[in-house]
């Protein structure tokens, strides 16, 4: 009986003391019904008809109470019946969260689930209060000290309960003042410049919000400043963060101990160098001896040593820098203590997170081979190559040790896939073209194979166009790629009231082979065929020059052309989509070959570079330039449908698509004459045979978007410029009358530049890339077609 009393005291229960063991002819459970009653009966150590002792009763009370499902448990005897009475905790039937915006609802729900607050769990109010407290502490860590988190429990029938987490996030506290103490050599203003957080001032519309995480980053920036300017012993000894009574303002005091400013006297490398002393010693030349000590220089050498060792298989090498201070002379010597560790062999390459992309596709980008020495350079190169595919939002790599082996590892690449496909269906209406229907499907990672497949079509009152494309980047094991297109277009605007009406039927195909030279360079060659049939076109001056050179007769043109294309590509971008570092450049050309009706060639050059301004690559400068030149040969002119135009996203934002270039000059007929005179200057753009474009952009963090989501959106401030001209204008214009020339600009001048400035936004949306831009022309000419707001689906800047 003493044992029974102890159990009652331990578990906060009361129970009738039995005088002696008895046989329970029946067992009754009070306080619950249904499934829970049956579960209790099934868990009891005794059954009806069995003998019940003190220990049995104690075990019943103990086991039910420690299950955590009951607030109270009692057991007693009523005659020959064992009665078990319980007060059950409520079962969670629903969980709701209201008032949150800073913390996503999904993140809060995942945290609730992990802490035992999902539907069907037992409600433990103490744990619920602890959860609310932890959320409130998180809000305080991001500067929202007045945030409230109130857990509300609504009791429902049948022992159920509904949880509501009511949140009031309030606003962040402002940094009211910032004070430094102990800084005798470095001014407070210099230290303040190292910080992102700045005191609130009257001229700041929104003030500066205080956030604990950013404050910690700023403290590290101050430490780095001291360490990189000779103060090798500098320390932040104390920080004092004081809130006002309303918890709306923060006053911060930072105490520092600067110490002496040192020069770097000498540096040496010792330890287990893995037999690579000759390769490691030259790395010390990057240090500036007898100059101000900079910790970042030492860190660079440490990383260079580990990288060099990693290239020879020492993937777990450690480097520790030990300073030797000479305070009298204010100098220090650095000893780099190296432990190369064991030389590692790669057992397997493994991939995680690739639910769409096949392992075999990712393996095509690997340079590290299984069963060979680990090489950190090749492992990193694999990461870079995966990033360049454009299939992934993020790519990370790590080394996993093998149980039971101290010299084997697995190299693991963890990827987060992005949507590489886009689907676009649209219906539009134009005053000239009438109702138009557009549809396109593009998949850059078809069935996870890495192949690109696309089909696009347009149908309106003027005609129909279809284009099928396919590219296989892994056509051979050596990395040779194979691509091709099949296209058809039927265009008829002869019923239009404009001067540019004509009919055109075009179809053809092409195939291209790409050959890698090294990790950054490749070249390609290709063959193509195009058939063009053009009729019912109005007589225009530039078209007429082309027709005369081709010796066409009648109002119709039919051409069969075969062309050879060639080019070189360079790519050092760190990512295939939204790159932040590196250069991409290309030189290319296309020329018709024997058997073609036309004789012409086209040359192009493009280059784009990205240069990060900060460590996190959130601020990036981008510069882009392109040029194109085309001309006929063999006494034949460039076809008028192969000229260049500019305008729109991709060349010159702020101007209508294809609206920049030399204008058409149509023939006028008078006095019943069948021969026209080229006098009618039109706003229609006929294009030129030379083009140059340039763009400079400052890529900035997108407002109201978290850092981890910055790689799915991009915001930029830009300046665009472009010019399209006719290099043969000096001779071409000789066929025009003087009064016409007076009304025309000099189409041969490359200096007729248009320019615009504005803001752009790109989003990798679930339906594909969306591009928006708003631009204002800063250099334009009379009658230019300005289009300030533009957008595109499935494209990029």
Swiss-Prot record:
Pfam families: Omp85, POTRA. Keywords: Cell outer membrane, Membrane, Repeat, Signal, Transmembrane, Transmembrane beta strand. Residues 22-89, 90-170, 173-259, 262-341, 344-418 form the POTRA domain. It comes from the Bacteria. Its main location: membrane. GO terms for cellular component: Bam protein complex. InterPro entries: Bac_surfAg_D15, BamA/TamA_POTRA, D15-like, OM_assembly_BamA, POTRA. Residues 1-19 form the signal peptide. It is found in: Cell outer membrane. GO terms for biological process: Gram-negative-bacterium-type cell outer membrane assembly; protein insertion into membrane. Belongs to the BamA family. HAMAP family: OM_assembly_BamA (MF_01430). Part of the outer membrane protein assembly complex, which is involved in assembly and insertion of beta-barrel proteins into the outer membrane. Part of the Bam complex. This is Outer membrane protein assembly factor BamA. It comes from Haemophilus influenzae.
